[in-house]
Amino acid sequence: MAHGGEMNTSIPCYGIIPARYDSSRFPGKPLADIWGRPMFWHVYAHAKRASVLRNIVLATDDERIAEAALEWEIPCVMTRRDHASGTDRVFEAASKLGVEPHAVIVNIQGDEPALDPAVIEQLVRPFLDGTVQVSTLATPISPERAASPNQVKVVTAANGDALYFSRSRIPFDREGGDGEILGHIGLYAFRMGVTRRYGFPFHFSTRIEFNSNSIPLISTVFHPVKANMES
């Protein structure tokens, strides 16, 4: 992975780590022990190394996670239990923290204990353009990995704009050849003010509208993907 230099920006950026206890596949995952510390501690420690983040907090709906965060001296915000997604939980936490409308919120996945802080800095860089409201990431993947429905792929236009995301194999090549396929990386950043247009909590139709925007793609090892929500 490529590592860029430290990014200097006056944009206020906050990292929020959603941590839900009641996962159907792995209940209590944020508390999973990794080398004597809970998983969320490792996520937080790696995120702290990203120089662009002014503050980082955990957002949870469970007292067990909140108590563990207190024990490890990690800031924590309690949220509702009925959120449909981690993104909704992140925005509730940001609202409770009184984050500025022009500030950038990075939704840091709570199950990425080895997260490279350079990836966060790449994700935030597009917001130096004041029109950018949403950013995410993609990276080239092998045809074998692309064949898995567990890997979300990114469809791009001829000019490199990301058009939509799909679990199906894309792009479809009628000649049977394989072009570069981009796999989506589930890390997002938003301007806080985006909630004023799309409302809170985000509903399924809103997420579809997010994904249907034409999103300029910047070519790096990890591709920051940015969207002008007015487009």
Q: What do these predicted ranges mean?
A:
Residues 1-6:
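Short, Lys/Arg-enriched N-terminal segments with co-localized hydrophobic residues
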Residues 9-59:
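N-terminal glycine-rich phosphate-binding loop and ensuing alpha1 helix
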Residues 53, 99-102, 131-133:
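Short, high-confidence coil segments that cap the C-terminus of an alpha-helix
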Residues 57, 64-108, 112-125:
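Short phosphate-binding loop-to-helix
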Residues 115-202:
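Conserved core of the sugar-phosphate nucleotidyltransferase
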Residues 200-204, 210, 222:
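Aromatic (phenylalanine/tyrosine) cluster motif
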Residues 205, 212-214, 219, 228-231:
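Low-acidity, Ser/Thr- and Arg-rich intrinsically disordered low-complexity segments
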